[in-house]
Curated annotation (Swiss-Prot):
The keyword Lipid metabolism does not apply. Transmembrane segments: none annotated. Part of the 30S ribosomal subunit. Contacts proteins S9 and S11. PANTHER family: RIBOSOMAL PROTEIN S7 (PTHR11205). One of its GO terms (biological process) is translation. InterPro entries: Ribosomal_uS7 (IPR000235), Ribosomal_uS7_bac/org-type (IPR005717), Ribosomal_uS7_CS (IPR020606), Ribosomal_uS7_dom (IPR023798), Ribosomal_uS7_dom_sf (IPR036823). This is Small ribosomal subunit protein uS7.
Length: 156
């Protein structure tokens, strides 16, 4: 542990268009090689596609998608008496959103649509409708935690 205490988390400014910190964090997750302009263009184009396809506010669709993606439980490896147990633990709120954004971006990149903004828009719309690869990842995480519920008493 550090002797001088912990550093404060850097405050993330909300994005200029939707005034949302979550959107700003998504832009940061999308960004490759420091190209924030490219990442924000991709995101705003994806939001335009969502507005065209659904007719709803893209921020509301995105927030619904994030609600469907963010995990409540996960498993963490714990070594007890020479064997490793997968111990289910609750996920902290900040980690919930971090995992949700990470899964959303990763599974968007794996999709087969032509452009990244199209992939991201489709993944967000799928997640808002409780389908898609990122929602499946959340379900798999919850299943793993449920399967290892017997080891919950090893929680620390």
């Amino acid at each position: 542990m550090p002797r001088k205490g912990y550093t404060k988390r850097q405050e993330i400014l909300p994005d200029p268009i939707y005034n949302s910190k979550l959107v700003s964090r998504l832009i940061n997750k999308l960004m490759l090689d420091g190209k924030r302009g490219t990442a924000s263009t991709i995101l705003y184009d994806a939001f335009d596609r969502i507005k065209e396809a659904t007719g709803n506010d893209p921020l509301e669709v995105f927030e619904q998608a994030m609600e469907n993606i963010m995990p409540v439980l996960e498993v963490k490896a714990r070594r007890v008496g020479g064997s490793n147990y997968q111990v289910p633990i609750e996920v902290r709120p900040d980690r919930r959103s971090t995992l949700g954004l990470r899964w959303l971006v990763n599974y968007s990149r794996l999709r087969n649509e032509h452009t990244m903004d199209e992939r991201l828009a489709k993944e967000i719309m799928d997640a808002a409708n409780d389908t898609g690869a990122s929602v499946k990842k959340r379900e798999d995480t919850h299943k793993m935690a449920e399967a290892n519920r017997a080891f919950a008493h090893y929680r620390w």
